[in-house]
Amino acid sequence: MEGKKAPRGKKNTNNMEVEDISKIQENAKHTIKYKYTTFDELKEQGEYNFFGIVYDASFPQEESSTSESDKKKNVTKYFCILKLIDQTTNCLTNPNNFNENVIYLIIKSTEKENIPFVHNIGDIIRVYRGFYAPKKKRNIYVNVCKDNKIKGSWCLYSTNNNSSEPYSCSNKQFSVETQDKQIIENTKTWVKNYLNIDKSLKYPLQVNLINRINDGNDNDLLVHVVKKIELNDQIVLFIQDASDGCELHTYKYYNFIQENDIIRVRSYKVFDNNNLIINEFGNILVLPPYSNCYKSLINDMTKKLKQIK
């Protein structure tokens, strides 16, 4: 009696059907849904998908200069600028020419909620369809349009938890693919190791708090939040570093800041009684406790207290 033939598309005793091989090859193509580009691979002008790590960020702003067509349509545009690094382009890989290599991500939209409000240095951003157009700086532009007609999109991920879900996103219909989860997990591990290294963060405009008045330049601070008070429409942060202390008055947008946080105050100005407010294009970003900058400031303040005692 003749044995039964193996069904088409299933394994024979000695070989595999061509149809099965084709299916495996086709499935392999779909395992990687998106191609992501690292910053050292950005050479030619064009559209790219990528992951970046937030090194610095401005607060979402209304764009002052709009086109004549926008004025006629009464269209308001918003934007923010993020400085990004990755495993291939950062303060350690480019110590002598970092500012020439850091990525400037400019995100624009007609809806303010589509502009990212970054909370922490070291947060991860995923960008789809960012347009790389290098000029004097390495700029990438993302336009998030009104009425869900999205030319580009972004998602923000915190490095302070183990979740692969974003805490903020420009597109409510975002997806997190299997490849994304692996990239996010690996990037979080890298960020924690990187920020723990000395000189992994360099902010040339940073000054000591005691020099906040003497220097009229547009400078930055790295300070410890001693106390936080919530008022009607604002919060008051009592801040200090190893040199001095004062008050920082700001809006409730920054209510995510907690007592004992170490924060980067990006662009400030002094007002009544030597207190501070944030400049128009300034921002406040929280430093993660595993970062070297965080630990260094705590050590400096501890030494200062011991000297006083």
Label the model's feature ranges.
Residues 1-309:
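Single-stranded nucleic acid-binding proteins centered on OB/S1-type folds
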